[in-house]
Amino acid sequence: MPNDRSVKRSVTVLGAGLAGTEAAWQVACAGIPVTLVEMRPVRRSPAHHSSDFAELVCSNSFGALSSDRAAGLLQEELRRLGSLVIRTADDHAVPAGGALAVDRGRYSAALTEILDQHPLVTIERREQMDLPEVDAVTVLATGPLTSESLANDLRGFTGRDDCHFFDAASPIVHGDSIDLNLAFRASRYDKGDADYINCPMNKAEFLAFREALLEAEQAELKDFDQESAKFFEGCLPIEELARRGEDTMRYGPLKPIGLWDPRWGDVNDRDVRRAKRAYAVVQLRQEDKDGRLWNLVGFQTNLKWGEQRRVLQMIPGLAQAEFVRFGVMHRNTFLESPQLLDPTLQFRTRRHLLAAGQITGTEGYAAAVAGGWLAGTNAARLVRGLDPIALPNTTMAGALTHFVSEAPTKKFQPMPPNFGLLPDLPERIRDKRARYGAYRDRSLADLEPIRALIPEPLLA
């Protein structure tokens, strides 16, 4: 492949989500012309609300910031690799306790403007109906909402039906419609500032709320069988959690542990704590820079919009909530990547074609960015006649790309960043936080040889 004279001297990136945006930037910054193809607004998807690049359709959070957490380690790796998408997230961060969350409108608009102004980036607003010609270096980053025509061509090329699951997004409410006489500001265990709004429930309120969720009418989903619906376990609809058992929500998004309203009394008084602590707590996270919009954390849902209003207004503090956006559910498509891709994210049967992002079977925003970084970097290297690179599997980014290219395929499912993907440490460390810190230290050290390959301007 290196020095292949048939390779075109430019790159095409299909899809301007998180992965495609990062891939296009890496190609352009390597001095290679890149065409970024995005079907919005010519063709809308069921989940997007704008035509801007890298729109966050589920949560506005990239996950934990701390580098001794899996998501935080991946973010730090990407910062060190010169990721535009993560750097811009840092620039547009909103308060979210120990997490990296962004003002999603300003964030996407900023990334769109940056790419639009780059002299080597050509943006084409159109639907790509099929894969480009064989000798074109192409990054497939069309995401979980790949259009049907392109998905059909992809099935013909791979000889495989796509895998899929159903994903959902949480509702968003106006902050000034939240009753802070009932709700309170705090972060769990008082970590960071009081960045969340918390709506406490007693047992009777929780049980009535769960019953309402179970009885509420769901929206009809197109093109799928209700009985065989597959959900991603990391983004289950709240009504699905309610169905799984009385306490499932209380050990998930509604867990009350570590949350205390000072108006209840002294948290250090055991009797007060036992008498006053909440049975369950609904949390809302700031959605925009100005704190006017708040999303219900973990409240992905497929309820009809009228039912969402009725049921969610049962939550203490949200009786008069004004909804900016209701929750929606959509089908997510991904490749059976272990049968198709190498750790370089090249297709094994077509080396000029690379894939990145959620379509490869990684889960989470930072994971999509990591795939975009690697695919874009390797696309540029192919055009320049250089060997593509694979990231060390001791890094979180490398562990994810090795997983999607090597995992057993009996039941391949999307995978988020997690320390279980990393090879064992040389010595066993019993303390979990210390162990995760050791994983981090090894990862960042092993990333240094890769950083040496990156042009200096990208590392600034």
Curated annotation (Swiss-Prot):
It is found in: Cytoplasm. One of its GO terms (biological process) is tRNA methylation. The keyword Transferase applies. GO terms for cellular component: cytosol. It catalyses: uridine(54) in tRNA + (6R)-5,10-methylene-5,6,7,8-tetrahydrofolate + NADH + H(+) = 5-methyluridine(54) in tRNA + (6S)-5,6,7,8-tetrahydrofolate + NAD(+); uridine(54) in tRNA + (6R)-5,10-methylene-5,6,7,8-tetrahydrofolate + NADPH + H(+) = 5-methyluridine(54) in tRNA + (6S)-5,6,7,8-tetrahydrofolate + NADP(+). Gene3D superfamilies: FAD/NAD(P)-binding domain. Its cofactor is FAD. The keyword DNA damage does not apply. GO terms for molecular function: flavin adenine dinucleotide binding; tRNA (uracil(54)-C5)-methyltransferase activity, 5,10-methylenetetrahydrofolate-dependent. Its EC number is 2.1.1.74. Keywords: Cytoplasm, FAD, Flavoprotein, Methyltransferase, NAD, NADP, Transferase, tRNA processing. FAD binds at G15, A16, G17, L18, A19, G20. Signal peptide: none annotated. It comes from the Bacteria. Catalyzes the folate-dependent formation of 5-methyl-uridine at position 54 (M-5-U54) in all tRNAs. Belongs to the MnmG family. TrmFO subfamily. This is Methylenetetrahydrofolate--tRNA-(uracil-5-)-methyltransferase TrmFO. It comes from Synechococcus sp. (strain CC9902). The lineage of its organism: Bacteria, Bacillati, Cyanobacteriota, Cyanophyceae, Synechococcales.
